[in-house]
Swiss-Prot record:
Name of the protein described by the UniProt record: Uncharacterized transporter C1529.01
Topological type in the membrane: Multi-pass membrane protein
Organism annotation: Schizosaccharomyces pombe (strain 972 / ATCC 24843) (Fission yeast)
Family annotation (Pfam families): MFS_1
Similarity comment: family membership: Belongs to the major facilitator superfamily.
InterPro entries: MFS, MFS_dom, MFS_trans_sf, Sugar_transporter_CS
UniProtKB keywords: Membrane, Transmembrane, Transmembrane helix, Transport
Length: 491
């Protein structure tokens, strides 16, 4: 049996004529209240906010150690600068691994279980970081904590695909994708004060307490949303109650032990990474932007403490500018992307296409490079602190606009396998986030903040124009070359 068999074209709403097969288990009607897409808005958004809260934890915990690296290095007698940077970067490296495992497993066991297991792993090993006695223990515990906290980063897009129709996804993606981007800006603001007034251990213990609170909320409130899991469980119950094995879903996987589905599920994102042109293009775009974001964020403390001579607690407040940009970009893009999508859909005789998400990416192409230019040259000439902060806010607006379009494009294209497709993007972007900061300070030392950020701006501008052109003019062709895409252009 082909375990990777595509479902029928109507998988988005599961509208299947059960008269042809009385044993086919599907939604009772297009308005079936058990279908997560038909849940009331309050229940949908409760799920989304919980998953977003989980997704906030990892990036926030990853960046919180930045202002305290000197404290941690002194505690463990770390002299080598690479070993010191590894305390931060090892967390980002595991972000590339975890979603490639958690996302496909959620397409076997469901979203809820994977989210909660990942959170428990994070709670245990993040607490252990505060208790570490050697640098080896710190590296190991940081790696394992990162593995657990990165689980939601691979499941967020899949959850959106489960809950929202294409016309509704813009605002949902706006909230979901804000979390992993807002985390790195919130973390240093909090840890800047921790570094100045208390011990580094409270970096780990504070995030553990917050994570435990979110986990407690999830126990009664977090529901399963994945259609395969919900319908598969319904088929199993019917077979058990009637002592038969005739009931099945459109995927015909109910009679296969779940462990046998694990291997093909784990191979799915790997296949996407190397064989699906549309995934490769979108992942490369996101990697460049995320890598540049982390390059700037990790060199932020140096700019404010060494060039502007601010105390760590005050220097950390400059991250608020990035947070403002992300929040503004999130709200603006959420409105813009849905309105643009509906407008283009009407012009296309009511037929949707993933390419209708491209205009919001194009809008981000202006803000991101412009913000980098402003940030770089105001920092170069030591203008008032508001100058670099305005630049940081601008490029974060552009980052959010671009991300919104790319993530929604992947969700529209891969539908029920949205989690796997976005896990690939998460993997590639996390590798970039690990690698880019390694040369960031050397680049600024050589080129200065002005030309260094100008170079980054030109890279963003070029990659964005290429990506937008390929998606808008050749997206349909690229999707045709990507055999795992579920969206059909005649739908």
């Amino acid at each position: 049996m082909d375990l990777e068999k595509k479902p029928q074209d109507k998988v988005e709403t599961a509208e299947i004529d059960v008269k042809e097969d009385p044993f086919l288990v599907t939604w009772q009607s297009p308005t079936d209240p058990k279908n997560p897409k038909n849940w009331i808005y309050a229940r949908k958004w409760t799920q989304l906010i919980l998953v977003s809260a989980f997704a906030l934890l990892g990036p926030m915990a990853s960046s919180m150690v930045a202002p305290c690296l000197d404290q941690i290095a002194d505690r463990f007698h770390i002299q080598n600068s690479t070993e010191k940077a590894l305390i931060l970067s090892i967390y980002l490296l595991v972000f590339a691994i975890s979603p490639m495992i958690s996302a496909p497993l959620s397409e076997v066991f469901g979203r809820r279980m994977l989210l909660q297991v990942g959170n428990v792993i994070f709670i245990v090993f993040n607490m252990a970081c505060g208790l570490a006695r050697t640098k080896a223990q710190m590296y190991i515990f940081r790696f394992l904590a990162g593995f657990g906290s990165a689980t939601p980063m691979g499941l967020g897009s899949g959850t959106i695909s489960d809950l929202f129709t294409p016309d509704e996804r813009g605002k949902a993606v706006a909230v979901m994708s804000l979390a992993p981007l807002l985390g790195p800006t919130i973390g240093p603001v909090v840890s800047g004060f921790i570094a100045e007034y208390t011990t580094y251990k409270w970096i780990f213990w504070s995030t553990t307490i917050f994570s435990g609170f979110i986990f407690a909320l999830s126990l009664p409130l977090l529901a399963e949303t994945y259609p395969k899991t919900l319908l598969g469980e319904k088929a199993r119950k019917l077979n058990k109650s009637e002592k038969t094995n005739k009931y099945h879903t459109e995927w015909n996987l109910e009679h296969i032990p779940r462990l046998k589905l694990v291997t093909p599920a784990l191979m799915r994102p790997i296949r996407m990474l190397f064989t699906q042109p549309i995934v490769i293009l979108c992942s490369t775009y996101m990697a460049i932007q995320y890598g540049i974001l982390y390059l700037v964020l990790t060199t932020y403390p140096t700019l404010w403490t060494e060039e502007y001579h601010e105390r760590p607690s005050i220097a950390g407040l400059n991250y608020i500018a990035s947070g403002i940009g992300l929040i503004f970009g999130s709200q603006a893009s959420g409105i813009f992307i849905d309105k643009t999508f509906r407008y283009l859909k009407r012009r296309n005789n009511g037929k949707m296409a993933p390419e209708f998400r491209v205009p919001v990416i194009l809008l981000g192409t202006f803000f991101f490079p412009a913000g980098l230019f402003i940030y770089g040259w105001t920092a170069q000439y030591h203008t008032h602190w508001i100058g670099p902060d305005i630049g940081a806010a601008m490029f974060n607006i552009g980052l959010m606009l671009g991300w919104r379009g790319i993530q929604t494009y992947l969700i529209d294209s891969f539908m029920i396998y949205a989690a796997s497709s976005t896990a690939v993007a998460c993997c590639v972007r996390s590798i970039a986030a690990f690698a880019f900061p390694l040369f960031g300070q050397d680049m600024y030392d050589t080129l200065g903040y002005g030309w260094g950020n100008s170079l980054l701006a030109f890279i963003v501008l070029g990659s964005s124009i290429i990506t937008c052109s390929l998606l808008w003019f050749g997206g349909k062709r690229l999707r045709a070359l990507s055999s795992m895409v579920i969206f059909k252009d005649d739908v």
